[in-house]
Amino acid sequence: MAAPQNYLAVIKVIGVGGGGVNAINRMIEVGLKGVEFIAINTDAQALLMSDADVKLDVGRELTRGLGAGANPAVGRKAAEDHREEIEEVLKGADMVFVTAGEGGGTGTGGAPVVANIARSLGALTIGVVTRPFTFEGRRRANQAEDGIAELREEVDTLIVIPNDRLLSISDRQVSVLDAFKSADQVLLSGVQGITDLITTPGLINLDFADVKSVMSEAGSALMGIGSARGDDRAVAAAEMAISSPLLEASIDGARGVLLSISGGSDLGLFEINEAAQLVSEAAHPEANIIFGAVIDDALGDEVRVTVIAAGFDGGQPPSKRDNVLGSSSAKREEPTPARPSESRPSFGSLGSVKPKEEPEPAPVPEPVADLPVSPPPVPPSRTYSDSAAEELDVPDFLK
C-alpha cells in the first residue's frame, strides 16, 4: 500500500548569505506559517544566530567557516561544492523562495546556484533579493547588478527590492540598524504576500496552481505594499501599493498580477472588489489577475494590500524609451500645428536630405508648405536645382 499523500504545497524559504539569513530570522520572528526555513552561509558564526529549521554551513572547507569576504566567486564555489547537500534539503518542495542581500559574497554568488538546484528539482522558484544601499559603496553595487543578472536566469520570477527606496519612506533620524531591519521587513512582505495566498484559508481562497500560473517563468516582477485605515481603506491601500516607493517602475502592462488583501473580520467583499478593480485597471487589459483575501484579526481596522506584478519583461524598458522619443519628436514638431496634414511626408523627405546639410532641418517641412513666398531670394544663388535648393535653404530664412 502506498503511503498517504500530503496534499499541502511544500514551501521552502532559503536564506543565502548574511542578508538572506537575517531576512529569514525576521520571518521566523513574526511567525510566518506553513513554510520550512533553510539557512545557507559560509559564515559559521552567523549561522549560529539563525533560528532556521535547517542550517547548512557551506564554507567549512573552503573558508573554514569564516565567510566569503564579499567575494561572489567564493560564494559560488562554496555552494557548488555542497550541491548535493543543498539538493537533499530542497527535495520535495513545490515552491522555493531564494532570498539574499545582493552585493556581498555568499548571497551574490551562492543564490544563483541554489536557485538552479531548486528549479532542476521541478520547484516553482522565486528570487526575492535586495539591492544594496548607496552608502555600501560602488563595488557592492556593481557586484549586486551582476548577481541579480545571474539570478534572473535561474529563477521563474525575480523580485528586486532597492534598499535606497526604503530611505524615501523612512524618517530622517532612522538608524542604520533600523534601515536594515526595514529591508528585512520588505523581504518578509514579499514572501508572506505570496505564501499567505496559498497557506491561509481566505474569504477568497487561492491554491498553489493559481500562484504558479502567474509566477512560472514570469521573469522580473515588481512588488508594492500598502496599508490604510478609515474610509475607503482598501482602495487607499491598493493605491499605495501600486504607487509604492519600492516600485522602480510602473505596473502598467503587467500580464500577471498577484493581489493579496488582508484585514480584520470586518473586511467587506465590496471593499475587496473595489481594491481589485483599481489594480486591474493599472495592469494590462488581458492580465491574469489572481487575488485573494485573508482575514487576520491582529490587523484590527487596518487593511494591508500586497501587489506582485510580473510578465512584462521587455515591455517596460521600451515603453520608457518611447516616452523619451515622443517628447523629443513633440519638441521638433512644435511649428507643425498650422498644417498637420503635411507634417509627416515633409518630415520624411527632409530626413533623406539631412545628412548633406545641417543636423537640424526637422523644423523645415511645415514652414516650407506654409511660406511659398520664401523661395524667391533663392534662385539667384542657385538657379540650377530649384526644389532641392528650396528645401535646403528655407531653414536659414526661417531662422
From Swiss-Prot:
Task: Give the protein family.
Answer: Belongs to the FtsZ family.
The record lists GTP as bound by 18-22, 105-107, 136, 140, 184
The Gene Ontology terms for molecular function here are: GTP binding; GTPase activity
Keywords attached to this Swiss-Prot or TrEMBL record, sorted alphabetically, are: Cell cycle, Cell division, Cytoplasm, GTP-binding, Nucleotide-binding, Septation
Q: What quaternary arrangement does the UniProt entry report? A: Homodimer. Polymerizes to form a dynamic ring structure in a strictly GTP-dependent manner. Interacts directly with several other division proteins.
What SUPFAM superfamilies does the record point to? Tubulin C-terminal domain-like, Tubulin nucleotide-binding domain-like
Renumbered to this chain, the Acidic residues biased-composition regions fall at 388-399
Biological-process GO terms, alphabetical? cell division; cell septum assembly; division septum assembly; FtsZ-dependent cytokinesis; protein polymerization
Per the UniProt record, the source organism is Streptomyces coelicolor (strain ATCC BAA-471 / A3(2) / M145)
Function, please? Essential cell division protein that forms a contractile ring structure (Z ring) at the future cell division site. The regulation of the ring assembly controls the timing and the location of cell division. One of the functions of the FtsZ ring is to recruit other cell division proteins to the septum to produce a new cell wall between the dividing cells. Binds GTP and shows GTPase activity.
Q: Which SMART domains match?
A: Tubulin, Tubulin_C
Region feature (Disordered): 311-399
Q: Which GO terms describe its cellular component?
A: cell division site; cytoplasm; division septum
Protein name per UniProt: Cell division protein FtsZ
Query: Keyword Cell membrane on this protein?
Result: no
